[in-house]
Amino acid sequence: MAFVHIRCLCFILLCTITGYSLEIKVNPPQDFEILDPGLLGYLYLQWKPPVVIEKFKGCTLEYELKYRNVDSDSWKTIITRNLIYKDGFDLNKGIEGKIRTHLSEHCTNGSEVQSPWIEASYGISDEGSLETKIQDMKCIYYNWQYLVCSWKPGKTVYSDTNYTMFFWYEGLDHALQCADYLQHDEKNVGCKLSNLDSSDYKDFFICVNGSSKLEPIRSSYTVFQLQNIVKPLPPEFLHISVENSIDIRMKWSTPGGPIPPRCYTYEIVIREDDISWESATDKNDMKLKRRANESEDLCFFVRCKVNIYCADDGIWSEWSEEECWEGYTGPDSKIIFIVPVCLFFIFLLLLLCLIVEKEEPEPTLSLHVDLNKEVCAYEDTLC
């Protein structure tokens, strides 16, 4: 009987606790919206506090914010106590977000209490047909010094169509227009940007729009981080040597410019006679074993890019000039052999000339004899 009473008591307590939890409710935030301040994709997600029940006025409110581009499979999630959150988006696609209120556990006897979700969305107007939008947009940050972006005109545009590029990154007061366009047939097909102060490791936003008297032009948006599209100069001053007839030692200098030496990774192609293979290193030298001791020549060339310690991605530089070490039977060895042989033959020729010259009679001696004969004959005649 006592056991039955205990079970009844537990049931009553459970119902009481559950009933209390069910009575705790919190409202969602108010006026949730996504705002575009004109920064080419850097948007503000903002809201107002919920209407709070009197007994929860001393409680700390937190907000769970989720947002994404509409074609993304995953949401970004933020827990914050602020009433605004800022982030970059791809404006080529729509944006959607949702938010709800969280009550802190000390106000709810340790249970989690959340409000329903409220949602908001944002998208730019699709002015102009998709075929008028630029094609093949490419941007390269050359040697971490200047940015070059290029594009092709839309598939179906009138001859009077021209494009304009704007850019923005955190630190600028407003979006700026390109001041140095690349042109083809007097049309803008690219832009060069220099002196991008404090622009690394933050989102870099670009918009290319166009104008035509005959039709509207669809805008194109791009967002990236500059350090991830760096294309360095190729390595310089290559040198290769062979030690102990076996060890190949290769050295090169890091390219000139602002990129720290620790930020490079290298790809090396080694050629030994007609065989070649690849290797990689984060240093500016490498030591390998020869694959064939009788090889007549060894050559290598190298390229570089920014490594994972300084960027999430990068673009390989052009290949360096090829540098070669030639074996002992190479052209240099032949020259060393030919020169002394030629000198030896020249010496023999000179010696032979001297010997021949000594064996021939002197012409002055025969002339002297003939003169004496003529004098004697002349004297006999006089007598």
Curated annotation (Swiss-Prot):
UniProt record, GO biological process: immunoglobulin mediated immune response; interleukin-13-mediated signaling pathway; negative regulation of immunoglobulin production; negative regulation of mast cell degranulation
Organism: Mus musculus (Mouse)
Record's subunit section: Interacts with IL4RA. Interacts with high affinity to interleukin-13 (IL13), but not to interleukin-4 (IL4).
Gene: Il13ra2
Keyword annotations: Cell membrane, Disulfide bond, Glycoprotein, Membrane, Receptor, Repeat, Secreted, Signal, Transmembrane, Transmembrane helix
Post-translational events: Cleaved by MMP8 leading to a soluble form that is also able to interact with IL13.
Coiled coil regions in record: none
Gene Ontology MF terms in the entry: cytokine receptor activity
Extracellular topology ranges: 22-334
UniProt note: domains: The WSXWS motif appears to be necessary for proper protein folding and thereby efficient intracellular transport and cell-surface receptor binding. The cytoplasmic domain functions as an inhibitor of IL-4 or IL-13-dependent activation of the Jak-Stat pathway.
Domain Fibronectin type-III: 28-128, 131-219, 234-332
Transmembrane spans: 335-355
Residues in the signal sequence: 1-21
Listed name of the protein: Interleukin-13 receptor subunit alpha-2
InterPro entries (UniProt xref): FN3_dom, FN3_sf, Ig-like_fold, Short_hematopoietin_rcpt_2_CS, TypeI_recpt_CBD
Domain of life: Eukaryota
Gene deletion effect: Il13ra2-deficient mice have greatly reduced levels of IL-13 in the serum but significantly greater tissue levels of IL-13 when compared with wild-type mice. Thus, regulates serum and tissue levels of IL-13.
